[in-house]
Amino acid sequence: MNRRAAAFAALLIALPALAACGGSGSGSDGGQAGFATDGTFAFAIDSDPGDLNPLVTNLVNAQIVGMYSYDTLIFLDPETAKPAPFLAEGWTESPTKVTYTLNDAITCADGTPFTAQTAADNLNWIVDPANKSPRLESVVPADAKASAKGNVLTVTTSKPRPFMLYDIGAQQLVCERGLKDPKSLSAGSDGTGPFAIDRVVAGDSITMTRREGYTWGSKNSTSNTPGMPKTVTTKIVPSPSTRANLLLSGQLNAAIVSGKDEERLAALKSQPTPAMSGMIVYNHHQGLPTAEAAVRRALTQAIDLDTLTKILTGGKGERAKSLLSVHPSRCAYDTVQGNLPSHDPDAAGQALRAVGKPVDITLVYDNSTDTGSAAAEYVAKQWETAGAAVKLDGGDENYIISRTFAAKDPSGWTASLGLNLQTGTPAIFPQYLSGPAAPAGTNFASIDNKDYNRSVAAAAGRTGDDACEAWAEAEKTLMTSADLIPVSVTPYKMYFNGATALYLPIGGSAIRVLK
């Protein structure tokens, strides 16, 4: 994966492996009497996570594994969407400065203290361009300067950085030994989390063992909390059918399964978590028909987005209300209603005919599922009926990235269906939806929306609810010009057998093994 693609991974979540925050669902079993002592817990991800060093990866599977061995400065409560203590017991924020007051009792798995200076060293390591961390800018601002005084970590930036408290607060942090030898973390761990990595078998599994002395976990979890497993095994299981089989046989305690295999799991408890399951991104590269707003609006008018949602989600999802799909998100707003062009096939046909030249579309789409292929065929049919010529170009998630975001020829695609951006932070979008176009920058769709750029500049200096209102206004400009279209959200389910979770994601201190 090249550097641009690695940076983009911060916005992508492979849905079968998804472990984003969600509600309590039906997965909660009441009472500590039902929890096992020193049990084992096995869960599945859909692909090898690669390098496990949390400072050098944006891959979601690596971050899921990292949640067992590494902690973050703050914990975003899934129920309230508010920050709660984790490594830090207090904090302050302004547009250009955040501080975190660390708990004095934090220790690494080997018993050494974890200090504010160690936290500062983590952030400065990411900022150092020599380390080429994909966490730079996607999480930690390039102009960030981190320092420590006593147990207080201070991070400053030269220009406003919205939601910096949350972004930096969500970075998994490593201990000093790991900072001095980063390569040792590629297949190992050195963190403050409740588990330490024992063994990594590439392409197969990762085994972890519970540490002693862990007392600062979210929801008051400790090393001695009933139900906290002694051993955790992450199994790499690409096939949803195989994941379902392993759940039913008891060889897995937790896994996300979607599609037809869910019918076999009806007797198991589950917890839902929403994710963007459908999005249309138009390529604005000069010379392409979709560089013109009139064409983008017409193509959008040609599609019944309600019908497309039913196809994409198998009837289980709903229309997306904004670009924010992860729960809990930093903001909650509806930028779609009243801003996207409404369904009008006749108007779409008239608009495309008015272009006066052929409208040739190469639609890159996700063909890894039946619903994805059916959705692409539906979209192609509507566009062809309106007068466009459509070429379908399907592949899996990695193929879609290679043809769009990491494409050697940025003009080689016209639109995508299946490149689903996943985030709960609106401030991460400008680096991908504005600025220098690929290959010079990360603006992979060559979007140049001046109203969006002005609105982003206004939103950048705000915090709290005011910031959310400003970011909503910025996002509306993307909808009115049909730059990209959030289509559908699906509640993907994490199924459990012999275990449960206090909340999703199921990392570290959230899991409980049942008797």
Model-derived segments and spans:
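Long beta-strand-rich cores associated with HINT superfamily self-processing modules
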Residues: L12, M494-K515
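Periplasmic binding protein-like
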Residues: F41-F43, L247, E384-P436, D466-A470
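N-terminal lobe/hinge region of extracytoplasmic solute-binding protein
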Residues: A44-P95, D190
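Surface-exposed binding/hinge segments that line
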Residues: K97-T99, R135-L179, P194, D198-V201
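Gly/Pro-rich hinge or "lid" segments in bacterial periplasmic/extracellular proteins
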Residues: I168-G227, T231
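Ligand-site clamp/hinge motif
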Residues: Y214-R264
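Structural transition elements
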Residues: E318-A354, T369-G372
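Extracytoplasmic/peripheral linker and loop segments enriched in polar/acidic and small residues
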Residues: K391-G394, N398-I400, F429-G498
